[in-house]
Amino acid sequence: MAGTKEIRTKIKSVQNTRKITKAMEMVAASKMRKAQERMRNARPYAEKVRNIAAHLASANPEFKHPFMVARDVKRAGMIVVTTDKGLCGGLNTNVLRAVTNELKDLQGQGVNVQATAIGTKGMQFLGRIGAKVVSHVVQLGDTPHLEKLIGAIKVQLDAYTNGEVDAVYLAYTKFINTMKQEPMVEQLLPLAADKLSQTEDEKRAYSWDYIYEPDAQTVVEELLVRYVEALVYQAVAENMASEQSARMVAMKAASDNAKNVIGELQLVYNKTRQAAITKELSEIVSGAAAV
């Protein structure tokens, strides 16, 4: 059995670790609230752009943007959104498992895939599996900015517009609530028909017409690009909210486990100390009896 000094050292070490995980839990909780706010604030912009683009598309049915035209998929692009840091439970593992399954399905159909990595963990993973990475962006920090993402996204959008890929997929972790985050792999391009369709309420709300400058086609082309960029930004915002939630939960679990370990070590320490005292008393009594 370990000595009391060794056990005290272990207890001190676990206590120090618990202080770190507790601090990280509190930091993650603070960042999570800010990330959730950014996520909610990003939604109205994307929805407004979608409404305007849908109105223009329905008013000009003769115009078909490449983003709206489905093609036989022989080559595909995939934008993979992950975190830059670890210590967030199985967040990255789950979304990268979904990416692996999607890649296997596409490759099984004879589809060649080129990838864009957003986040260090995804970049490292794609490098390990030998995927073709055509663009990447890492170290976004706690506050993602669209201008940092546009360069990496544009590579995939240009590839689709030029016919180099026939579909683009988006993989990220969707924020459900603090305790639940769901890995997603969605088709980004071509845009699904329901993405640019209006409900009856929306048609009544947007029953008026626009004055197009310079013309409707140019406006629709620009809006659709902005809309797709907004969808990717929304995915990054959701992923960051998921990251902080998962990290807060993981650090809380680590703190709770450390507390349990400290309790167990304290019990062992007390038993060891009691045994040592009992032994000393026995030796004293034996010595006195011998005299």
Swiss-Prot record:
Q: Which UniProt keywords apply?
A: ATP synthesis, Cell inner membrane, Cell membrane, CF(1), Hydrogen ion transport, Ion transport, Membrane, Transport
Q: Which GO terms describe its biological process?
A: proton motive force-driven plasma membrane ATP synthesis
Q: Is Iron there in the keyword field?
A: no
The signal peptide stretch is none
Subcellular localization(s) per the UniProt record: Cell inner membrane
One GO location term (cellular component): proton-transporting ATP synthase complex
Annotated GO molecular function terms are: ATP binding; proton-transporting ATP synthase activity, rotational mechanism
Keyword Ribonucleoprotein part of the UniProt annotation? no
SUPFAM superfamilies the record matches: ATP synthase (F1-ATPase), gamma subunit
Question: What is its membrane topology?
Answer: Peripheral membrane protein
Name a Pfam family for this protein: ATP-synt
Family per UniProt? Belongs to the ATPase gamma chain family.
Q: Quaternary state and partners of this protein? A: F-type ATPases have 2 components, CF(1) - the catalytic core - and CF(0) - the membrane proton channel. CF(1) has five subunits: alpha(3), beta(3), gamma(1), delta(1), epsilon(1). CF(0) has three main subunits: a, b and c.
Q: What does this protein do?
A: Produces ATP from ADP in the presence of a proton gradient across the membrane. The gamma chain is believed to be important in regulating ATPase activity and the flow of protons through the CF(0) complex.
Protein's recorded name: ATP synthase gamma chain
Q: Which gene encodes it?
A: atpG
